Amino acid sequence: MNKISKNIILIGMPGCGKSSIGEKLARSLNIEFCDIDLCIESKLNMTIPQIFKKGELYFRRTESEVLETISKSYPQVIATGGGVVKDYRNIEVLKQNGVIIYINRPLDQIVKDIDIKNRPLISDGIEKVYLLYEERHKLYESYSDIEILNDKSEAETVLKILKKTFVDI
């Protein structure tokens, strides 16, 4: 019997590990995993870069609609897009049935690993990562219930999440 009664929602910078950590976390808890970006792509039958060509506002509206629907099913692990914090209504929706975890990865590690070509907001160059961090870091901190430092392996980060959320494995 599963003891988890809420969604586990991962927020953080692009490239911080939300999707890969989320998949591993969901597997270890034997619950569903949802990557919001993949749900958006599926809903619109377009890639994220194609969606952004219609404008960031179009993407954000769709993101909010998908979050509203997805967050009603629980328990599951949800990996959000990095910009989910730009609209506080998204946070309110997610907090109704979930605990929000900020995956904080050091910027030097993100910059070293990130593939910018499929990330529309940073496709102009890696310096955009620093600008996004300045814009969003305080939002991630203030909207999260728990902050986890992802500075080692993904497996270690999953263990940190499990310990902080007091989930028995």
Which residues fall in each region the model found?
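NTP-dependent small-molecule kinase module
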Residues: M1-K3, S20, K24, S28, ...
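Hydrophobic anchor at the beta1->P-loop junction of P-loop NTPases
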Residues: L10
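P-loop (Walker A) phosphate-binding loop of NTP-binding proteins
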Residues: M13
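Conserved glycine(s) of the Walker
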Residues: G17
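Post-Walker A helix-loop "phosphate-sensing" segment adjacent to the P-loop in P-loop NTPases
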Residues: R27-L38
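ATP-dependent small-molecule kinase phosphotransfer cores
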Residues: L38-V84, Y88-E92, E134
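Short glycine-rich anion-binding loops that position phosphate/pyrophosphate groups of nucleotides
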Residues: G82-V84, P106-D108, S153
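A glycine- and Lys/Arg-enriched "phosphate-lid" helix/loop adjacent to the NTP-binding pocket
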Residues: N97-K138
